[in-house]
Amino acid sequence: KLGLDDTAFSGRFGIADFARQSLRAQLKGDKLDLDRYLPAKAKQAQDAASATRKAEVDATVASAAQGNTPLPEKPTRQAWSDAPLLPIATLRKLDLDVALNFGRLTVEKLPIDDASLKLRGQGGVISLDDMRGGLYNGRFNAKANLDVRQDSAVLTATKHIANVPVERLLEAQGKKPPVKGLLDLDADIRTSGNSEKSWIDHLNGNARFSLINGVLPDANLEQQLCQGIATLNRKALAGTHGGKDTPFRELKGSLNFTNGVASNPDLKVAIPGLAVSGHGDIDLRVLGMDYRIGVEIQGDKSDMPDPACQVNQRYAGIEWPLLCRGPLELGAKACRLDKEGMGKVAAKLAGNRLNEKLEEKLGDKVSPELKDALKGLFNRK
């Protein structure tokens, strides 16, 4: 039996080659908190970077939360520390082959239950062959490879997460979650360097994600949609609406990472009564977003929250345009009505009305071909 601080180990442990300090082990431990062994300077630098960004973001979040202010700006402060994290010289000398199991393993404040991992290292290349465990009643597994033979460490990793509540992941990092739901994620990434900032700046790869049975807390989508409809109805809203949690059945899409910026070309959100789609970027370097969103009203259209934004048949199939920009902490509260896009919607509706009147005037007096030609005149951009 072995002990490390308050962790008790049992199993086999040995040195296969004393000259090369070749470590071989199969160990089982009750619990281990890896965060306790993070270098103090690195942790202080992380806290300082977080505090600098927080000061900038807090003001934006406070002013934008009501949804009736101008479109928020993206944050500009770096969110990550440039303090070195890995003891590169030590890692180059490692010669190990170990299998570890823990009742609970804490990594970056995340409690992993029934954790198991296999780790091999030789010649400056360290491989995490398999790491898996339970996380907030969901599951995850990961594989990774760290190459420290050169001056700049190169890290590649694949990760799979299933049925993990995303809000618990964010809350563990001390963040207020802008979205809640059960997360499924598959990611394949590559990066280089030896600090948080470097790893984010050089992050490349791809991922697919899906959140089910979730909520957009304090979302103002209803307010923005109602404002757009009221504008076309040429009426003023009686008051401010929204601010309630917006439930969704599924939120999904794919991410393509390029030097720390995640492009999301295919965002889809299924909300009762609404179909939401969009595309945009998430800048992980500053934790900011910039999206174009379209919202289409489906199902029952009789329960809009204000008399000024009642929906009529003319609005069937119309995609209402929103712009969403600002720090990730805002979530859906970063969305505002796209005024330029609304101009195009108004023009389309005006063309539709002209076509309806033309149909009434022409009746059966002219051929279908001529009708189509005349209608086309009004639909040109």
Task: Write out the residue ranges for each language-model feature.
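Beta-propeller and related beta-repeat scaffolds in trafficking/envelope systems
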Residues: K1, Y37-G124, G133-L135, D147-Q150, ...
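Extended terminal
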Residues: K1-A25, A62-S63, R190-L203, L237-K381
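Outer-membrane beta-barrel pore domains and translocons
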Residues: L2, K28-D30, N101-G103, G133-G134, ...
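Membrane-embedded beta-strand positions of outer-membrane beta-barrel proteins
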Residues: G11, A25-L27, V98-L100, A142, ...
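Extended, hydrophobic alpha-helical segments in both membrane/secreted and soluble proteins
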Residues: G11, I126-L128, G138-A144
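Outer-membrane beta-barrel translocator/pore domains, especially the C-terminal barrels
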Residues: D33, A153-L169, P178-D184, V215-P217
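Short, surface-exposed coil-to-beta transition loops
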Residues: D113-D114, N141, A275-S277
